[in-house]
């Protein structure tokens, strides 16, 4: 191929796929490691190749960027006649992906969420790719197994707080920047300010975006401030009933039902539509902002355990038993090279040490000020902890969500509910 020297090796069909599948909730991964196959056009006979990559985003700007990179690649590699980006619904992305795999319709490349990374990486479904020294070690950890890399950490997106400064002023409340200056940017203050916003304006105070009383792992952006964990470091013991988690969940329960600082179950509020004063979300959501209100972007509030950073991650992997592994790995190398990473960083923060400075990030994130980039983005990428992950994630995720349901009632017994969560999931953690 005539593309620049790839960052990753180009194996033959299935050459670098490990063959030690683990028990998975998604049988599709086992199906792939057992029999392989993809629905992309085959290049094994020297004919033209079609590559397909599953992604979660349907955003026009995102797709324009991705298709532009694909066009550049095809110009240099005419044997690849087409590169398709197949958007799957975000709320059912992993299920849809594993269903495709189980049905013999595996893509050549796939976007993989952090919560399903352990299953994909440990299953043997992915082709090994070459490590890149420019990518921060912490960003690669989730995508490695026994010292080898099986997916490129495509997006390492720190969580922070977007604030509607106009709404806060209307409610007579301090902005996060003012609270930071006073040394009072804490979750306790968020509850007070959020409750006051609700009282004065009728709008929501604080929204944990994409939580919606379903995506419980997004609450890590709160409970990490208490030093809480859902399970032990080795993944074998439930920790929902530990004092730190009990205190964090008690705070959340009070913020929702006592202070009314956060939307209650059954209600929604979109910060970017002007319906909330503050929201916890990732830098990539900045693309949703317009000039309809004044805003700021600041680090997560401090909790009793002090300051902390949380990141969401997505990896890009090559399904290893397909017909076009060599071409897929080569395209992945091109897509994630230094030049393209700089362009992708506008929407999908890159964990490259060579690009982690405010001046470089400002070129692809013009909406954010250098101080915001330094404090939230660079600090978050360098120091952030990835949201909770575990093998058998789909089954485990559903079990936790169901066991937490009784918590979201005004008269809930927080401690007992969390004990019940552990009773529900401990057998799964021990598998």
Mark where each language-model region is.
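Glycine-centered hinge/linker elements that transmit conformational signals in sensory
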Residues: 194, 233-264
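Mature extracytoplasmic/periplasmic domains
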Residues: 269, 287, 316-394, 430
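Short helix-initiation/N-cap motifs at beta->coil->alpha
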Residues: 86-96, 115, 183-189, 261-273, ...
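Short, solvent-exposed loop/beta-turn-alpha elements that line the ligand-binding surface or hinge
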Residues: 127-135, 178-182, 205-208, 228-247, ...
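Periplasmic-binding protein-like
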Residues: 160, 294-317
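Hinge/lid segment of periplasmic solute-binding proteins
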Residues: 112-160, 188-189, 298, 364-367, ...
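Conserved N-terminal structural module of periplasmic/extracytoplasmic solute-binding proteins
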Residues: 2-117, 304, 323-327, 339, ...
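Extracytoplasmic/periplasmic solute-binding protein
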Residues: 150-154, 159, 186-237, 276
């Amino acid at each position: 191929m005539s593309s620049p020297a790839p960052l990753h090796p180009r194996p033959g069909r299935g050459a670098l796929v490990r063959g030690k599948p683990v028990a998975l909730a998604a049988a599709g991964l086992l199906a792939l490691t057992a029999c392989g196959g993809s629905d992309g056009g085959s290049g094994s006979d020297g004919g033209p190749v079609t590559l397909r990559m599953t992604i979660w985003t349907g955003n026009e700007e995102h797709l324009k960027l991705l298709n532009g990179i694909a066009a550049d690649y095809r110009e240099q590699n005419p044997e690849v006649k087409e590169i398709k980006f197949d958007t799957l619904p975000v709320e059912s992305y992993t299920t849809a992906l594993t269903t495709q795999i189980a049905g013999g319709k595996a893509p050549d490349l796939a976007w993989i969420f952090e919560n399903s990374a352990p299953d994909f990486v440990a299953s043997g479904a992915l082709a090994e790719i070459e490590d890149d020294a420019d990518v921060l070690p912490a960003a690669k950890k989730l995508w490695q197994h026994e010292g080898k890399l099986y997916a490129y950490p495509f997006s390492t997106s720190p969580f922070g707080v977007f604030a509607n400064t106009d709404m806060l002023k209307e409610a007579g409340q301090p902005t996060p920047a003012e609270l930071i200056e006073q040394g009072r940017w804490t979750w306790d203050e968020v509850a007070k300010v959020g409750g006051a916003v609700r009282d004065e304006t009728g709008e929501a105070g604080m929204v944990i975006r994409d939580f919606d009383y379903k995506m419980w792992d997004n609450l890590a952006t709160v409970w990490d401030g208490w030093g809480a964990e859902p399970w032990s470091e080795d993944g074998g013991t439930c920790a929902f009933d530990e004092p730190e988690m009990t205190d964090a969940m008690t705070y959340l329960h009070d913020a929702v039902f006592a202070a009314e600082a956060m939307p209650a179950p059954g209600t929604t509020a979109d910060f970017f539509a002007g319906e909330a004063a503050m929201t916890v979300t990732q830098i990539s959501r900045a693309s949703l902002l317009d000039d309809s209100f004044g805003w700021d972007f600041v680090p997560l509030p401090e909790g009793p355990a002090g300051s902390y950073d949380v990141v969401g991650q997505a990896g890009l992997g090559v399904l290893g038993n397909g017909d076009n592994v060599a071409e897929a790995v080569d395209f992945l190398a091109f897509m994630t090279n230094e030049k393209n990473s700089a362009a992708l960083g506008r929407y999908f923060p890159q964990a490259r040490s060579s690009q982690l400075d405010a001046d470089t990030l400002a070129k692809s994130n013009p909406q954010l000020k250098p101080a915001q980039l330094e404090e939230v983005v660079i600090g978050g990428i360098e120091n952030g902890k990835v949201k909770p992950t575990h093998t058998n994630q789909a089954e485990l995720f559903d079990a936790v969500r169901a066991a937490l349901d009784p918590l979201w009632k005004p008269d809930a017994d927080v401690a007992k509910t969390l004990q019940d969560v552990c009773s529900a999931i401990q057998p799964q953690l021990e598998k």
